[in-house]
A protein has these predicted regions:
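Juxtamembrane low-complexity tails/linkers enriched in Ser/Thr-Pro and polybasic
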Residues: 1-2
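Low-complexity, disordered linker/stalk regions enriched in Pro/Thr/Ser/Gly
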Residues: 5-12, 17-220
Length: 220
């Protein structure tokens, strides 16, 4: 009986310690750093700011899901602060920052950023409020490839040699007899070469890992 009471007492002490530790973590000066690390954020310059002074990047929606795509990528950002937010900026190197167009001077802002050109970069986003405090920089990835692969075919006796290249990776060589129904030959690489026998009049094309399709070539 005494042993059970002792164990119960120890359990109560442990629970109290956990509660106190949780309080310190979420209401002390290290709270923002901890939350930032849990949400993939990087360091802020406001090391001595009081809890709650810093703006917060609440949500970032990346239309690409951080995977390689062959379309425009939209970044939708929501930020808030106890003070009015004066700007939301983006950077590719954490040194050079550019302000995102939007409606500011409110405590909750939503802004949108669209990328259209080919790129493979890490994007950083931060918010600044009227007191000059900055949020932790949110990190996401932009991977766009709209450039179609290139394909060259050559004929040697009954065989056709196909050479395909791409800025990222060629994922398949496709062939068809009617330009409507295509069969895949799986490949992988920035530059690939295959030799195969095709009937005269067969159409060939290359597809890259982003889904871009090359010009069609015909076996003569």
């Amino acid at each position: 009986m005494k042993k059970d009471k002792k164990n119960l007492f120890i359990l109560i002490i442990v629970i109290i310690c956990i509660i106190v530790l949780s309080y310190l973590l979420f209401f002390s000066g290290i709270t923002n750093k901890l939350k930032a690390s849990l949400n993939g954020l990087t360091a802020s310059i406001n090391e001595n700011a009081n809890q709650g002074d810093l703006p917060i990047i609440n949500n970032v929606i990346n239309s690409s899901g951080e995977v390689l795509v062959n379309t425009d990528v939209a970044i939708i950002i929501n930020a808030s602060s106890i003070y009015n937010i004066t700007k939301v900026e983006y950077s590719f190197d954490l040194k050079n920052w550019k302000k995102i167009d939007g409606s500011y001077n409110t405590k909750n802002v939503n802004v949108k950023l669209v990328f259209k050109d080919d790129m493979d970069k890490i994007l950083y986003i931060r918010a600044t409020n009227e007191k000059g405090y900055q949020s932790y920089a949110y990190k996401t990835a932009i991977k766009i490839d709209k450039t179609a692969p290139k394909i060259i075919i050559g004929k040697y006796k009954n065989d056709t040699t196909i050479k395909a290249s791409d800025l990222n990776k060629v994922s398949s060589i496709q062939y068809s007899s009617d330009k409507l129904n295509w069969e895949d030959i799986n490949v992988s690489g920035g530059e690939v070469t295959i030799t195969k026998t095709f009937d005269k009049g067969t159409y060939l094309r290359a597809v890259d890992s982003a889904g871009n399709i090359s010009k069609i070539k015909e076996v003569k």
